[in-house]
């Protein structure tokens, strides 16, 4: 049997139990997209707040309402930076708030964006 998978845009809803590990990944994926995502049932620990603030520093717009986040991603900045010589070279100040998970995720992500990143 041959199976062909055709690429399509994704849309829909996924509900997962609150998990700090999954929350880091969900926030980062949404923040790197070039669309808007809503994530419900987020447990806002200090580590997750550090990841949220880091993604904001790269240009994502993140709004909180209760345990839900609406994230407009900064993915367009990554694409534009790769094709535009005049992309911003502003320094990104990232305060990981002593979150090892945030630091481990965000250091490699910082290489996607123009300009230096300083981690404190």
Which stretches of residues belong to each language-model region?
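Short, structured segments at the rim of ligand-binding sites
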Residues: 1-120
């Amino acid at each position: 049997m041959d199976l062909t998978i055709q690429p399509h845009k994704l849309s829909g809803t996924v509900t997962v139990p609150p998990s700090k590990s999954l929350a880091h990944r969900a926030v980062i994926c949404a923040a790197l997209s070039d669309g808007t995502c809503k994530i419900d049932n987020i447990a806002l620990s200090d580590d997750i707040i550090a990841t949220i603030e880091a993604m904001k520093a790269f240009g994502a717009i993140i709004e909180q309402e209760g345990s839900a986040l609406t994230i407009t991603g900064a993915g367009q900045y990554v694409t534009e930076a790769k094709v535009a010589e005049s992309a911003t070279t502003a320094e990104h100040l990232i305060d990981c708030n002593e979150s090892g998970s945030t630091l481990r995720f965000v250091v490699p992500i910082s290489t996607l964006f123009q300009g230096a990143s300083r981690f404190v």
